[in-house]
Amino acid sequence: VNDEGFYTLLIGAADMGTGCDTTLAQIAAEVLECPLDNITTLSADTDWSPYDSGSYASSTTYVTGKATEKCALELRGKICALGCDKEQVSFDGREVRVEEGENAGKTISLSDIATASMNGNSIELQATVTHSSEISPPPYMVGAAEIEVDTETGEVTLLDYAAAVDCGT
């Protein structure tokens, strides 16, 4: 979170036309309850981006998407912790609101929290999370071949072949 309350999402996935930059930012925006425009996505530069095993069809959404969700949840927790120490609080994407106790109803904006995090507090408003899964949806492909078989020799001749591939999101 920068001092204006905007987010930077740093991912290792490469957007090869599948839209993962947008999809992963949408996941983060959903968890952080902020407009998509409040998130800048920086992706796939081996000099500074985190490791990602690769962009393989919908597995980017499932695997890197889960890491994005977990990371945004961790960041929400840090925002709430810095926004109000030892009180029951809620966060609606714009401000932290105290729900109970003598400070009930008081709020502090996300930009004020982000600025405070840069000034002598021990809570840094950033999170790094990894996620892996034994289950990841593969891309789907179907192929159909038209062949001719010589019944005397057993020789097979390929006459035509058609394929369709679903590369996922």
Model-assigned labels for residue ranges:
Residues 1-169:
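Cofactor-binding beta-sheet edge motifs in enzyme active sites
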